[in-house]
């Protein structure tokens, strides 16, 4: 199996981060609809479960990495009363433009801001945030370990990193059902609805290539987190990871 850094959306010589930026700029207008469709609406439930895991920490400032169209940032402001400010960073301007529209419609523009930044080189001082989150974005990092190191760096002592990611089921029969769905349904429907043949072939490939469960928890520990654990959701097709600095 190829390393996640080798799995890219397009067959070009461009670095992965540039390809990911181009892909999300291209599919931005379809992203939310397809995200809800392919997860059967469960992506909303997964976000809410993930948010509940950081709520006890009562963060005031949150960094949402790979914020996309801002769904997680908005849900954080809705459901965690202690949060004063969420900073969303992403490579894709088109995704964040949609996010800005959603934030304005929710009257949250005084609590959520967006910045186009690479998660591997965050423009923040050490110990800047009470929590860091990333939903459905870790597998797109050009270097997952470096991304974890950067998120660790900007966290305050004792603060949580929460990662929500898609995952490969390992139990019968969910594994077999997922493999068919990921290999045959997602690429065909995604190609038809998004007009991007590569983007929704890349999706299951990137999920398959990234470290998962114990492997990712161990990687989190290796970059400095004093505690790392995970919780499987919805027949193992999604996983929430928590790391404590």
UniProtKB/Swiss-Prot annotation:
<comment type="function">
    <text>Methyltransferase required for the conversion of demethylmenaquinol (DMKH2) to menaquinol (MKH2).</text>
</comment>
<dbReference type="GO" id="GO:0043770">
    <property type="term" value="F:demethylmenaquinone methyltransferase activity"/>
</dbReference>
<feature type="binding site">
    <location>
        <position position="90"/>
    </location>
    <ligand>
        <name>S-adenosyl-L-methionine</name>
    </ligand>
</feature>
<comment type="pathway">
    <text>Quinol/quinone metabolism; menaquinone biosynthesis; menaquinol from 1,4-dihydroxy-2-naphthoate: step 2/2.</text>
</comment>
<keyword id="KW-0474">Menaquinone biosynthesis</keyword>
<keyword id="KW-0808">Transferase</keyword>
<dbReference type="InterPro" id="IPR004033">
    <property type="entry name" value="UbiE/COQ5_MeTrFase"/>
</dbReference>
<comment type="similarity">
    <text>Belongs to the class I-like SAM-binding methyltransferase superfamily. MenG/UbiE family.</text>
</comment>
<dbReference type="Pfam" id="PF01209">
    <property type="entry name" value="Ubie_methyltran"/>
</dbReference>
<protein>
    <recommendedName>
        <fullName>Demethylmenaquinone methyltransferase</fullName>
        <ecNumber>2.1.1.163</ecNumber>
    </recommendedName>
</protein>
<feature type="binding site">
    <location>
        <begin position="118"/>
        <end position="119"/>
    </location>
    <ligand>
        <name>S-adenosyl-L-methionine</name>
    </ligand>
</feature>
<feature type="binding site">
    <location>
        <position position="69"/>
    </location>
    <ligand>
        <name>S-adenosyl-L-methionine</name>
    </ligand>
</feature>
<keyword id="KW-0489">Methyltransferase</keyword>
<dbReference type="GO" id="GO:0009234">
    <property type="term" value="P:menaquinone biosynthetic process"/>
</dbReference>
<dbReference type="InterPro" id="IPR029063">
    <property type="entry name" value="SAM-dependent_MTases_sf"/>
</dbReference>
<keyword id="KW-0949">S-adenosyl-L-methionine</keyword>
<dbReference type="GO" id="GO:0032259">
    <property type="term" value="P:methylation"/>
</dbReference>
């Amino acid at each position: 199996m190829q390393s996640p850094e080798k799995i890219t959306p397009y067959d070009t010589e461009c670095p992965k981060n540039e390809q990911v930026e181009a892909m999300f700029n291209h599919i931005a207008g379809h992203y939310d609809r397809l995200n809800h469709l392919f997860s059967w609406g469960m992506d909303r439930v997964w976000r809410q479960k993930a948010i509940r895991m950081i709520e006890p920490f009562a963060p005031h400032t949150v960094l949402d990495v790979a914020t996309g169209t801002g769904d997680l940032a908005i849900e954080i402001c809705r459901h965690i009363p202690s949060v004063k400010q969420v900073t969303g960073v992403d490579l894709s301007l088109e995704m964040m433009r949609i996010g800005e529209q959603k934030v304005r419609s929710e009257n949250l523009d005084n609590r959520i801001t967006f910045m186009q930044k690479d998660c591997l080189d965050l423009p923040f001082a050490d110990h800047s945030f009470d929590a860091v989150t990333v939903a459905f974005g870790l597998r797109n990092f050009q270097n997952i370990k470096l991304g974890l190191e950067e998120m660790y760096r900007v966290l305050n002592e004792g603060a949580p990193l929460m990662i929500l990611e898609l995952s490969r089921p390992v139990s019968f029969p969910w594994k077999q059902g997922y493999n068919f769905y990921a290999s045959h349904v997602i690429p065909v429907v995604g190609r038809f609805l998004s007009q991007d043949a590569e983007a929704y072939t890349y999706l299951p490939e990137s999920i398959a290539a990234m470290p998962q469960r114990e492997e990712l928890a161990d990687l989190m520990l290796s970059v400095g987190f004093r505690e790392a654990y995970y919780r499987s959701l919805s027949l193992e097709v999604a996983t929430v990871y928590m790391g404590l600095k």
